[in-house]
Every structure is written in structure tokens, then in C-alpha cells.
Regions:
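Extracytoplasmic/periplasmic substrate-recognition and gating elements
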Residues: 46, 50-51, 130, 150-152, ...
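Extracytoplasmic "Venus flytrap"/periplasmic binding protein-like
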Residues: 43, 47-116, 123-125, 150-159, ...
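Short, solvent-exposed loop/beta-turn-alpha elements that line the ligand-binding surface or hinge
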Residues: 105-116, 180, 185-186, 201-223, ...
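Glycine-centered hinge/linker elements that transmit conformational signals in sensory
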Residues: 167-170, 174, 211-240, 286, ...
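Periplasmic solute-binding protein
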Residues: 92-100, 120-156, 184-208, 297-306, ...
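Long, aromatic- and glycine/proline-rich binding clefts that accommodate carbohydrate-like moieties
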Residues: 119, 123, 281-285, 332-384, ...
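Extracytoplasmic "Venus flytrap"
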Residues: 26-43, 62-64, 138, 189, ...
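Hinge/lid segment of periplasmic solute-binding proteins
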Residues: 88-141, 163-167, 179-180, 191-194, ...
Length: 411
């Protein structure tokens, strides 16, 4: 009997020790498109796990187009679902309505908030709730091929979208490249981001007297420019099927003189190992309709804790690490840091002076896409109608009126 008691006690102590040393397992959802690469996120996570051996992070990567639906579909999974998710600036209204993310307002100190760019914080806040930490501070820039512009005899950078089109026409006429412009116009959120960049540059907003409006002069001007650039042979028609990576590859291959894309393309297009135009890449704020004006879309994203997570403290520990200033500074070549003082760091600035100069202008004029709990439905309609225009199936006026009608029915 004594041996039996001692045996049970030993087993209990072994089980307790095993329980005490067992790592908490987190499930984290990321995307495989733009900003940080999958290999970079894995490297960040491995460093976190090394510093925190009691936490194990299981990573899942999906295309951006699948990210939203993955988060929504997992809401009933409870502790078996995701703990940490990457979310876009356009989803907080919907995620608040359906309680998909935990409010972490109490976890972020006032000191941290003061050190983060306001535009980045806005990405994760809705109706007074903070749904995560900003992680990707991003917008779209106008990239240009310096060698092509020089060969065309273009000595000054375009200051307006009209000048971009004029320069593109010169480049085409001189047969330097067949299609000087390339965009992300596939029927996806990328199309909405390009459209929003143009609307911003033309001085537009999406709300008129508190109501959504897509038939404003700025909106119609944006859509007409998109269509005319195709009709005039300036935009590569394949743009209607392109996402951001397609744009990067086309530009890096020397198949375009101008491209609209996120931050991550700057250093990748300047990398001789994966680009034929390394050293020829220029970057500037997307222009507007008058010299001195710029346009930009808020393409920032945050990391949040799923409502069903049973490991909120460890999830926050991981998020805090991933969004920390040292980690962001170390990976600043693919996504600029959310921390203000990072831009005084010589390592962050190195070889990125042109990018950061452009960011200084663009990040201050970012236009947010409409904040509505029904954003996914609205975006789907907008994508469809824009594609109708780009393929010649509808006029800009008719297409945007159709979007207005759909927007009026949103809850």
C-alpha cells in the first residue's frame, strides 16, 4: 500500500511538472501578400519563441482575399480557433458589430499611444474600442523607372495624374515600353485601393452629408482616368487581372515605366537578385489633380486577439513582441515602423531615404475606405462595377450610380 501511495505521488509530481513546463500553443493567422514576407514572419516568430519558450505559435498563411472569411468562419471555434489574427483597416466596424476581436484598450499604455503615428492607431480603433495593435503602416506610392524616363527625355517628375498620362504617352510613342502603366485592377480589394488612391488625389471623400456617395466629381474623375488610360493604350490591359505581386513582377521585369504599389515593392524592385531594374527604381507620393497635391489610401493593418481565444495574455505577449519597435526597425525594409522615433534611426533610414521622404507626405493624406459593418458587401459591389467600366460594360456614371444604390441599402 505504501509503495502504491508513493507511486501515485511520483506520477502526480511528474504530471504536475509536465503541466508546468508545457508550452501554451497559439494559433495565428497571417497573409501571404505584400508587406512582411512569410519567411520574415516565421523568423520573427522563431525569435519570439526562443525568448519565450513557454509559448508555441502555430502559423497559418492565406492570400489576402481569404483572410477576412477565415477570421469570420472561425468565430464559432472557441478555443480551437485563432488566437491572433491580422486584420485590415476596413474591418473594425464589422468585427465590432459581431464581436470578433477582443477590446485591448486597457493593454496599450498611454505612453505607447503617444509614440505611435495617429494614422496607424486609427487603423485599429472603432467606436472607442481598440481592437488590436497597428502592425503594418502602409499606403500606395507611385513607382517610376528612372532609366525609362531619362531615355524618353523626361527631365521632371510628374506633379499631377494628367502629367503622368502625358509622360506615359511620350514613353509609348518612343516605343520604350508597350504599356507604360501597370495597376492592381483584378476584381479584388486591390482594385478598390487603387481607386481610393485616385479619389484621394482628386480631393474626394466617400461621405457626403453623412451618406455614402460614389458619384462625386472626384470619384467619377478617378474612374474616367482609369478607363481612358486603358482606351489610350497607356495601361497594360492585363492590369484588369493583376494583384499587387503581378504589378511588382511586371515593373521589376522592366515591363512598365510607372506602377502603383505598396511599400514592400521598393526594396524588392531594387534587389538585383529578383529585379531587372534594380538601381533604376524611383518612388514618389501618388499625385493629385494639381501640383502640390497627393493622394493615398489607408492600407494599414493590425494584429488582434480573437474573441474566442482562451490564451489572451499569451496572445498579447506575442502581439506586443511582433509590433515592438526593435522588431519593426529590424524589418523596416518591407514595412515602415508605426513608431515615430524610428525615423530618427540611421539603420531604418539607410538606403530608404526616398521611400521615407515619400511616406512623409503620403501617410499624412491617407483616405480611409468607408467604415461600415457591411463593408465586404459594399466592396464587392464596387469591385464589380469598376470592372464593368474597365471592361467596357458600363459607363463611369452608370456604374457609380449602381454603387450608390447598393450603398443606400446597407444597414
Amino acid at each position: 500500500m505504501k509503495k502504491s501511495v508513493h507511486g501515485c505521488l511520483a506520477l502526480f509530481l511528474l504530471a504536475s511538472a509536465a503541466s508546468a513546463t508545457a508550452a501554451t500553443s497559439l494559433n495565428a493567422l497571417f497573409m501571404t501578400q505584400a508587406a512582411y514576407s512569410e519567411s520574415d514572419i516565421r523568423a520573427m516568430t522563431q525569435a519570439f519563441e526562443k525568448a519565450n519558450p513557454d509559448v508555441k505559435v502555430n502559423l497559418e498563411f492565406v492570400p489576402y482575399e481569404a483572410l477576412h472569411d477565415k477570421i469570420v468562419a472561425a468565430r464559432g471555434a472557441g478555443g480551437n480557433g485563432y488566437d491572433v489574427v491580422l486584420f485590415d483597416a476596413i474591418w473594425p466596424a464589422e468585427f465590432t458589430k459581431f464581436n470578433l476581436l477582443q477590446d485591448i484598450s486597457s493593454r496599450i499604455s498611454a505612453e505607447d499611444k503617444a509614440q505611435i503615428f495617429p494614422g496607424a492607431l486609427k487603423t485599429v480603433v472603432f467606436n472607442g474600442k481598440t481592437l488590436g495593435m497597428p502592425w503594418i503602416l502602409d499606403t500606395k506610392y507611385l513607382y517610376y523607372n528612372k532609366a525609362m524616363l531619362e531615355k524618353a527625355g523626361i527631365r521632371e517628375l510628374p506633379q499631377t495624374w494628367q502629367q503622368v498620362m502625358d509622360d506615359a504617352r511620350i514613353i509609348k510613342e518612343k516605343k520604350i515600353v508597350n504599356y507604360p502603366l501597370v495597376w492592381s485592377w483584378s476584381q479584388a480589394e486591390a482594385l478598390v485601393c487603387d481607386y481610393t488612391t485616385l479619389v484621394s488625389g482628386f480631393g474626394g471623400q466617400f461621405y457626403q452629408n453623412g451618406k455614402l456617395s460614389f458619384s462625386s466629381p472626384a470619384s467619377l474623375q478617378a474612374v474616367k482616368l482609369m478607363k481612358s488610360s486603358l482606351d489610350d493604350g497607356l495601361t497594360n490591359p492585363a492590369s484588369r487581372e493583376y494583384l499587387e505581386e503581378d504589378v511588382r513582377k511586371a515593373f521589376s521585369n522592366g515591363d512598365a515605366a510607372f506602377a502603383l504599389n505598396w511599400t514592400y515593392m521598393y526594396n524588392m524592385a531594387n534587389d538585383a537578385k529578383q529585379s531587372k531594374v534594380a538601381g533604376q527604381v524611383g518612388i514618389m507620393p501618388a499625385p493629385g489633380d494639381a501640383p502640390g497635391k497627393a493622394g493615398a489610401v489607408n492600407g494599414s493593418m493590425g494584429l488582434g486577439i480573437a474573441s474566442g481565444s482562451t490564451h489572451a495574455d499569451q496572445a498579447w505577449q506575442y502581439i506586443r513582441y511582433m509590433t515592438s519597435q526593435p522588431v519593426q526597425n529590424n524589418y523596416a525594409r518591407l514595412s515602415l515602423p508605426i513608431w515615430k522615433s524610428s525615423y530618427q534611426d540611421a539603420a531604418v533610414m539607410k538606403d530608404q531615404e526616398s521611400l521615407i521622404k515619400a511616406a512623409d507626405t503620403s501617410l499624412s493624406v491617407m483616405l480611409s475606405r468607408p467604415e461600415t459593418a457591411d463593408y465586404s458587401r459594399l466592396s464587392s459591389t464596387l469591385q464589380q462595377q469598376l470592372q464593368q467600366v474597365l471592361t467596357g460594360g458600363a459607363t463611369p456614371e452608370a456604374a457609380m450610380q449602381a454603387v450608390d444604390k447598393s450603398a443606400a441599402r446597407l444597414r
